[in-house]
Regions:
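Short, low-complexity, disordered segments immediately C-terminal to signal peptides
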Residues: 22-41
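Conserved "Asn-ladder"/turn position within leucine-rich repeats
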Residues: 111, 133, 155-156, 178, ...
Length: 270
């Protein structure tokens, strides 16, 4: 046993010596390599499954719209850093929310759909087009707090705007040609700049009185009788109140005096 100890010791010493004399230490850069984030300044989104019911025609139309948008972005080279996955058209997969993380704009207009529940988890959207459909339930949009632009004109029987109450970042909202009467859910959307409410059932403008950043407001074709709530909207530049048979001419004149820089469009006969 005693004769083996120095041999082992010598072998270790030689091994260590070889490491010092023949192998140069690797250079370590003081600057870490740059890493391209998927989306800057945005916390990671928890993966959730998005279900498209193959027996639900509305779901299939929404899936197709998402697919079209993904393909367009892929063709434009916008998916190169994110590994965007295209949904197989006939596979009807369980799509993960992370797969469409890059979608900030989606057009599902003119599809004659009523059920928009598949949009619930796409809360990263900034612009959403849902014009010319049959939507009456907006609850799937309640968590879409990143939306800047929402287009809902031409849905006919849409009345309840309460699911929009927390969309505080909205800048543009199209609601023309619906059946909206109650504007109270919009009272807290103080970042709105462009609001289109033509051809609805609106008769009370009080909820709009605090929307100080409104620049364009279209109220034509409603049941309004006074414009007093708009008197303090100092940034308002364009107001349409044409086709408002219950609105007296003197209301228009009073508002014009209060907001001299606002162009008010109205029927000459009023």
């Amino acid at each position: 046993m005693s004769s083996q100890v120095p041999i082992v010791f010598i072998m270790l010493a030689v091994g260590l010596g070889c490491g010092k004399t023949e192998v140069e230490p690797a250079e370590i850069s003081a600057t870490p390599p740059a890493v391209q984030p998927l989306i800057e300044s945005t916390p990671p989104i928890v993966q959730k499954e998005l279900f498209f019911d193959q027996d639900n025609l509305d779901h299939r139309k929404i899936e197709t719209a998402i697919n079209v948008t993904l393909r367009q972005k892929k063709q434009q080279g916008q998916a190169s850093l994110t590994g965007m996955r295209i949904i197989p058209r006939r596979a009807w997969p369980k799509l993960k929310s992370g797969d469409v993380l890059q979608l900030t704009e989606l057009d599902v207009g003119g599809k004659d759909i009523a059920d928009i529940s598949p949009l619930t988890e796409l809360s990263q959207l900034k612009s959403l087009f849902l014009t010319e459909n049959r939507i009456t339930d907006l609850s799937p949009l309640a968590g879409h707090t990143q939306l800047l632009s929402l287009t809902l004109d031409g849905n006919g029987q849409l009345q309840d705007l309460s699911p929009l109450v927390n969309l505080k970042g909205l800048r543009l909202l199209y609601l023309d040609r619906n059946h909206v009467a109650d504007l109270s859910p919009l009272a807290g959307l103080t970042e709105l700049k462009y609001l289109y409410l033509r051809d609805n059932q609106v008769d009370n403008l009080e909820p709009l009185g605090n929307l100080k950043h409104l620049v364009v407001l279209d109220l034509g074709g409603n049941k309004i009788t006074d414009l007093i709530p708009l008197m303090n909207l100092s940034e308002l530049k364009h107001l349409s109140v044409d086709d408002s048979p219950y609105l007296p001419q003197d209301e228009i004149e009073k508002l014009q005096s209060a907001l001299p820089h606002c162009k008010i469009s109205h029927d000459a006969s009023e």
